[in-house]
């Protein structure tokens, strides 16, 4: 990724080094990456090499669960699944939704980005129309396809709860949840005029009423700004991107989210700031003001300056 032509490769390398050290120090059981590993469907060779190195270092010490986002080419990202290690789970196929990865005493439900036009037939649980053998396609919206995906999660969870399995459940959707704050470095995923999904969808899991014990945490992907989402009983959080990709993210502290669980629930959600190799700053003023009052804190930062 670049910022106005400047490579952010050194910032990515610094983050990976820090993350591996943190995972080792804190004894993290699993690293969840909810999509947008790359910025484009066909990433450059150096980005592929960097990702392979990061996955190799992380899977030596923990489990990694990785899904495809709207920026990623799902088929190309799936190539990482050939890294022969049981500690790496790469989920790019919507048909895999509803099958959890059991990690760290929790049930983790990976959910790759769902493009409505591509999955409204395959994920449909609507009755067949007329004499057709296929189910009726879902409505052309993110709300409809994510709802259908969550019903698959619900079906698996219901069966497990009925069998006495009360382990905490974590979902990994890649979507724009209503109430979230975007930045100008995300790509528009609007379909049918509606880009977002309602937060309470994660309470009901696509049905009318919540389960007695449904999801315990939602590790959402897509937005670059770290933030909690209100509107649901289950905690929903975007960890955000580890590096700022636009000047609209100035002032937002980058972080990762550490989620602690016990045998049945989430017990703690800790936000850990990421050390910044180079910050993002936005300055405004006359040329005289800017020269007369230099901001020492921005010496090593990428700076956007508006001269008035």
Residues covered by each model-derived region:
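Short, surface-exposed connector motifs at secondary-structure boundaries
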Residues: 58-66, 299-301
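His/Asp/Glu-rich metal-coordinating catalytic cores
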Residues: 43, 57, 68-233
């Amino acid at each position: 990724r670049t910022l106005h032509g400047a490579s952010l490769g050194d910032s990515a390398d610094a983050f990976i080094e820090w993350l591996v050290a943190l995972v080792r120090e804190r004894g993290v059981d699993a690293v969840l990456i909810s999509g947008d590993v790359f910025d484009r469907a066909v990433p450059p060779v150096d980005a592929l090499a960097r990702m392979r190195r990061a996955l190799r270092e992380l899977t030596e010490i923990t489990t990694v669960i990785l899904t495809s986002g709207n920026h990623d080419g799902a088929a190309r990202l799936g190539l990482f699944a050939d890294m022969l290690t049981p500690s790496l789970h790469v989920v790019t196929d919507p048909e895999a939704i509803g099958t959890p990865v059991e990690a760290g005493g929790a049930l983790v439900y990976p959910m790759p980005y769902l493009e409505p036009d591509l999955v409204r037939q395959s994920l449909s649980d609507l009755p067949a129309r007329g004499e057709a053998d296929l189910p009726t396609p879902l409505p052309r919206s993110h709300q409809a396809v994510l709802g259908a995906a969550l019903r698959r999660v619900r079906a698996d969870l219901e069966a497990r709860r009925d069998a006495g399995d009360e382990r905490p459940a974590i979902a990994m959707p890649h979507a724009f949840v209503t109430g979230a704050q975007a930045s100008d470095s995300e790509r528009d995923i609007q379909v049918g005029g509606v880009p977002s999904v309602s937060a309470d969808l994660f309470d009901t899991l696509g049905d009318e009423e919540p389960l007695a014990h449904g999801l315990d945490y939602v590790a959402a992907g897509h937005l670059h700004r770290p933030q909690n989402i209100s509107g649901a009983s289950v905690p929903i959080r975007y960890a955000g991107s580890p590096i700022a990709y636009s000047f609209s993210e100035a002032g937002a502290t980058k972080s990762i989210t550490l989620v602690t669980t016990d045998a049945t629930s989430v017990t703690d959600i800790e936000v850990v700031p990421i050390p910044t190799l180079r910050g993002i700053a936005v300055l405004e003023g006359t040329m005289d003001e800017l020269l007369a009052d230099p901001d020492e804190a921005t010496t090593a930062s990428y700076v956007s300056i508006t001269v008035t």
